[in-house]
Curated annotation (Swiss-Prot):
The keyword Ribosomal protein applies. It comes from Rhodomonas salina (Cryptomonas salina). The keyword RNA-binding applies. GO terms for molecular function: rRNA binding; structural constituent of ribosome. The gene is rps3. This is Small ribosomal subunit protein uS3c. Keywords: Chloroplast, Plastid, Ribonucleoprotein, Ribosomal protein, RNA-binding, rRNA-binding. The lineage of its organism: Eukaryota, Cryptophyceae, Pyrenomonadales, Pyrenomonadaceae, Rhodomonas.
Amino acid sequence: MGQKVHPLGFRLRITQTHRSSWFASSKNYPETLAEDYAIRNYVKVNLSSAGISKVEIHRKSDQVELEIHTSRPGIIVGRSGSGIDTIKEDLRKIINKNNQIRINVTELKNVDADANLIAEFIAQQLEKRIAFRRATRQAIQRAQRANVQGIKVQVSGRLNGAEIARSEWVREGRVPLQTLRADIDYATKEADTTYGKLGVKVWVFNGEKTPSIAKVEV
């Protein structure tokens, strides 16, 4: 059987960077990793309406820097920065009290070409009982207008309320998953419908990049 590797992890340090950047001793590593998970879960649950694309976490000795890429920065920042202050207060309950918290909010330039937001759009449409073929077609058309070079969408589960679960996918353009220099964006989402959960997977091909693997002098 064919084995599938995660498209983003497969391209780390080639076209993708790590979403968490820090170093910890073996003693503190589990605690730091648990903090990262809690931070990401907080953003996922409490900022779900902000159109979050990705969250990057950078740590220094006494500072945690959170970079949030979003399509709606106003929801996160709030009036006069009140939203940022609320997030910081909530995060202080999660992370080490001695660490300073810094939050940067980056607005996405091309919303319709982002795999996370495309998957989120399809999931929302499915939850509104829109037929899966119509939802995927709308998402693909929006991505094509955003000038992506290729897109693939897969929806799995009891499609349109069918008795037997199945998977269906649609692809437009090129999506070269075996080419390491290909700039592939990938995301998964779940849609809660009256017939159960539907899984949504989205691959977006944004062209090829020249690999920039860092050289390490020995």
